[in-house]
């Protein structure tokens, strides 16, 4: 759809990413971003101050797919190595956490994630690219529920996933075969 293509290109440009994917909802954006790099037996690490819908997705729905979510204090990126193992696939946070409204140190979390060979995926729904561009602070993937602040009035539903283009999936092909190797 050319209209969707223009929408995706504009969101990618606003975030400073190389491309974007429009989704039906913000929950779909989060789900696609996570399921794209995980599978049964894998785990993710998420900052503990999450939007309730994302918390339910990570703690209950993903469990049905055999994916574990480990929670971490958003003020302690130095604790990340203790939660990561060979089956960890990503670190997830929110720029401004909903509903607590704590602001996450994106640079510190991106650095901690990258040191362990993991992408840092961040939900920037509350901040929008007008207030914060997480890619400029090291985030690898940015997700949005465009229903809220980007849409401005909540009369339509939508979501988006933006790829920064800076995570080297091929360097970690053992951890991300679906991103770094051809289909079998």
Identify the role of each PLM range.
Residues 1-9, 13, 18:
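A glycine-/small-polar-enriched, mobile loop at the entrance of the PLP active site in fold-type I
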Residues 20-184:
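Conserved PLP-enzyme active-site core in the AAT-like
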């Amino acid at each position: 759809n050319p209209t969707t293509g223009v929408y995706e290109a504009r969101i990618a440009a606003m975030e400073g990413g190389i491309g974007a994917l429009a989704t039906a909802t913000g929950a779909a954006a989060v789900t696609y971003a996570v399921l794209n790099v995980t599978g049964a037996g894998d785990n993710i690490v998420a900052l503990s101050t999450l939007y309730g819908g994302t918390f339910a997705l990570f703690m209950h729905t993903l469990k049905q797919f055999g994916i574990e979510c480990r929670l971490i204090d958003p003020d302690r990126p130095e604790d990340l190595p203790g939660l990561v193992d060979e089956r960890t696939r990503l670190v997830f946070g929110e720029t401004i956490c909903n509903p607590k409204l704590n602001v996450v140190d994106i640079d510190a979390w991106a650095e901690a994630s990258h040191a362990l060979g993991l992408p840092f995926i961040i939900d920037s729904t509350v901040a929008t690219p007008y207030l914060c561009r997480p890619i400029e602070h090291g985030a690898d993937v940015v997700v949005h529920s465009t229903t809220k602040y980007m849409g401005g009035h909540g009369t339509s539903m939508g979501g988006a996933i933006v790829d920064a283009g800076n995570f080297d999936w091929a360097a970690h092909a053992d951890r991300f075969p679906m991103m770094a190797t051809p289909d079998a």
